[in-house]
């Protein structure tokens, strides 16, 4: 079974834990309880392949920013989560993206831009801006609502597909070992 190490990043209060718990337990967490760091595992079937998702739900609070480099090193793919009703959380996505690219020392890191809280009527980040930003980054974007479960599976599954593409690109770039044969 293939394992995928997914990391959920974003500002505090954007719904990272709510999205993760909705995926894992099919349950919406109403109250806000700031996360320091939680890890979840779930077996799912994506495109006919059984996968084990190892999901790290991270702290959004600034006081835990020192921990970020460590989990960014170990993660294979990242959900960049912001709240559609909070423009500042969208602006801060660029900082998370840059930090991931710096820590990974690569421009080619699987990521998905996730606009959460789409069930709320007070959207301050319009869909076109999100779409254009994602296109500029060269990554997919998914609108979600942890409350209604809209787009939750799609966000995580899209990230797994991005990791698969990344693995294929990098496996194809590895030089093939030549077998040596001696005839005596």
UniProtKB/Swiss-Prot annotation:
<dbReference type="InterPro" id="IPR001806">
    <property type="entry name" value="Small_GTPase"/>
</dbReference>
<keyword id="KW-0378">Hydrolase</keyword>
<keyword id="KW-0547">Nucleotide-binding</keyword>
<dbReference type="GO" id="GO:0022414">
    <property type="term" value="P:reproductive process"/>
</dbReference>
<keyword id="KW-0472">Membrane</keyword>
<comment type="function">
    <text>GTP-binding protein with GTPase activity. The level of let-60 controls the switch between vulval and hypodermal cell fates during C.elegans vulval induction. May stimulate the guanine nucleotide exchange factor (GEF) activity of rap-1. May induce nuclear condensation.</text>
</comment>
<feature type="propeptide" description="Removed in mature form">
    <location>
        <begin position="182"/>
        <end position="184"/>
    </location>
</feature>
<dbReference type="GO" id="GO:0005525">
    <property type="term" value="F:GTP binding"/>
</dbReference>
<keyword id="KW-0449">Lipoprotein</keyword>
<dbReference type="GO" id="GO:0042659">
    <property type="term" value="P:regulation of cell fate specification"/>
</dbReference>
<comment type="subunit">
    <text>Interacts with soc-2. Interacts (in GTP-bound form) with plc-1 (via Ras-associating domain 1).</text>
</comment>
<dbReference type="GO" id="GO:0072327">
    <property type="term" value="P:vulval cell fate specification"/>
</dbReference>
<dbReference type="Pfam" id="PF00071">
    <property type="entry name" value="Ras"/>
</dbReference>
<dbReference type="InterPro" id="IPR020849">
    <property type="entry name" value="Small_GTPase_Ras-type"/>
</dbReference>
<feature type="modified residue" description="Cysteine methyl ester">
    <location>
        <position position="181"/>
    </location>
</feature>
<dbReference type="GO" id="GO:0040028">
    <property type="term" value="P:regulation of vulval development"/>
</dbReference>
<dbReference type="InterPro" id="IPR027417">
    <property type="entry name" value="P-loop_NTPase"/>
</dbReference>
<dbReference type="GO" id="GO:0003924">
    <property type="term" value="F:GTPase activity"/>
</dbReference>
<feature type="binding site">
    <location>
        <begin position="57"/>
        <end position="61"/>
    </location>
    <ligand>
        <name>GTP</name>
    </ligand>
</feature>
<dbReference type="GO" id="GO:0005886">
    <property type="term" value="C:plasma membrane"/>
</dbReference>
<dbReference type="GO" id="GO:0007614">
    <property type="term" value="P:short-term memory"/>
</dbReference>
<dbReference type="GO" id="GO:0048477">
    <property type="term" value="P:oogenesis"/>
</dbReference>
<dbReference type="GO" id="GO:0002119">
    <property type="term" value="P:nematode larval development"/>
</dbReference>
<comment type="similarity">
    <text>Belongs to the small GTPase superfamily. Ras family.</text>
</comment>
<dbReference type="GO" id="GO:0007173">
    <property type="term" value="P:epidermal growth factor receptor signaling pathway"/>
</dbReference>
<dbReference type="GO" id="GO:0007265">
    <property type="term" value="P:Ras protein signal transduction"/>
</dbReference>
<feature type="binding site">
    <location>
        <begin position="10"/>
        <end position="17"/>
    </location>
    <ligand>
        <name>GTP</name>
    </ligand>
</feature>
<keyword id="KW-0488">Methylation</keyword>
<dbReference type="GO" id="GO:0043274">
    <property type="term" value="F:phospholipase binding"/>
</dbReference>
<feature type="lipid moiety-binding region" description="S-farnesyl cysteine">
    <location>
        <position position="181"/>
    </location>
</feature>
<dbReference type="GO" id="GO:1902685">
    <property type="term" value="P:positive regulation of receptor localization to synapse"/>
</dbReference>
<feature type="short sequence motif" description="Effector region">
    <location>
        <begin position="32"/>
        <end position="40"/>
    </location>
</feature>
<keyword id="KW-0636">Prenylation</keyword>
<dbReference type="GO" id="GO:0120283">
    <property type="term" value="F:protein serine/threonine kinase binding"/>
</dbReference>
<dbReference type="GO" id="GO:0040026">
    <property type="term" value="P:positive regulation of vulval development"/>
</dbReference>
<keyword id="KW-0342">GTP-binding</keyword>
<dbReference type="GO" id="GO:0031344">
    <property type="term" value="P:regulation of cell projection organization"/>
</dbReference>
<dbReference type="InterPro" id="IPR005225">
    <property type="entry name" value="Small_GTP-bd"/>
</dbReference>
<dbReference type="GO" id="GO:0008306">
    <property type="term" value="P:associative learning"/>
</dbReference>
<dbReference type="GO" id="GO:0019003">
    <property type="term" value="F:GDP binding"/>
</dbReference>
<feature type="binding site">
    <location>
        <begin position="116"/>
        <end position="119"/>
    </location>
    <ligand>
        <name>GTP</name>
    </ligand>
</feature>
<dbReference type="GO" id="GO:0005938">
    <property type="term" value="C:cell cortex"/>
</dbReference>
